[in-house]
């Protein structure tokens, strides 16, 4: 069985036999800030250690200010970004099906990323970076 590896926003390494398919068990990468990034080196489309078909990987993070998320996605997976409301209900705010890029402006809140596959075993890579505030007012000198 292959391992999924996440390089977190502070350089921490998470290696798992498989990432959680449920939001409750998803790795929480913490609070995103300008200049931070993370990467996922994953595998999907095989039976996991619990004997369940592994077709989705999930992870979570949050923002405390307006940030732009730039995702270099893998063309072999469907990528969805969700936002959680105060009750923990997830709503899709952006997605790309078998594309290589997803860029979104994020407001403060809790978010999650899902990576899906419809076929057999694949390896995939996703890299994310957070870029400065958007929508901030500029003060005259």
Language model features: what each stretch is:
Residues 1-2, 42-123:
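Acidic, Ser/Thr/Pro-rich low-complexity intrinsically disordered segments
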Residues 1-68, 74, 129-141:
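Non-catalytic extracellular/lumenal accessory regions of secreted precursors
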């Amino acid at each position: 069985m292959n391992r999924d590896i996440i390089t977190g926003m502070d350089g921490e390494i998470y290696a798992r036999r498989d990432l959680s398919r449920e939001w409750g068990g998803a790795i929480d990468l913490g609070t995103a800030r300008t200049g931070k990034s993370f990467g996922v080196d994953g595998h999907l489309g095989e039976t996991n250690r619990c004997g369940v078909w592994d077709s989705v990987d999930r992870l979570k993070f949050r923002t405390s200010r307006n940030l732009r998320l730039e995702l270099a996605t893998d063309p072999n997976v469907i990528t969805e970004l969700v936002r959680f409301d105060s009750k923990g209900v997830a709503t899709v705010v952006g997605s790309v099906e078998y594309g290589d890029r997803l860029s979104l402006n994020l407001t403060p809140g809790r978010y999650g990323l899902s990576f899906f596959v419809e076929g057999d075993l694949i390896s995939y890579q996703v890299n994310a970076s957070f870029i400065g505030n958007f929508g901030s007012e500029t003060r005259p000198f």
